[in-house]
Amino acid sequence: MSVETIKAESHGLRSAVSIELQEPTPHFSDDVWQILKFHGIYQQHDRDVRGRNNRVYSFMVRSKLPGGRLTAQQYLIQDALADQFGQGDLRFTTRQGIQLHGVIKGNLQTTMKSLNDVLVTTLGACGDVSRNVMSCPAPYGDAVRTQLQETAEALA
């Protein structure tokens, strides 16, 4: 089935995500995996054990930060999640996003809720979408930078 067909039949990009989150498997089905991208999540497996009988799955969660801005609280929660549920580091992208690698399936809901609680979104951070609207996040107080940041946030 094509990605476009999967999206069209996904009930607003919900698909069976909530059902498969409750299943004890360490990964998602191929159809749900395609939908997860639009929620800012990539399913991955450890390449060092590729080809063996059992794949070791983990997930990358990418935050979408319009204009590259985030509060101290938003950064600190991502840093804490990296230590608690990830591989202990964060990766900053050229599109002004933050990637949290190494999250296992059983910790995805808590990770996503923690991000959402501090108003960090992952929606549209991955997949075949416009991933972010970038602008200079420097905290200068001139009118032009303020207008650019407001426009980036509105467009994102």
Identify the residue ranges that each predicted region occupies:
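Serine/threonine-rich low-complexity intrinsically disordered regions
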Residues: S2, S29-D31, N107, T146
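Short glycine-/aliphatic-rich beta-strand segments at the starts of folded cytosolic domains
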Residues: H11, V17-P26, D30-R69, R131-P139
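Small-residue-enriched alpha-helical segments and adjacent helix-cap loops
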Residues: S58-A156
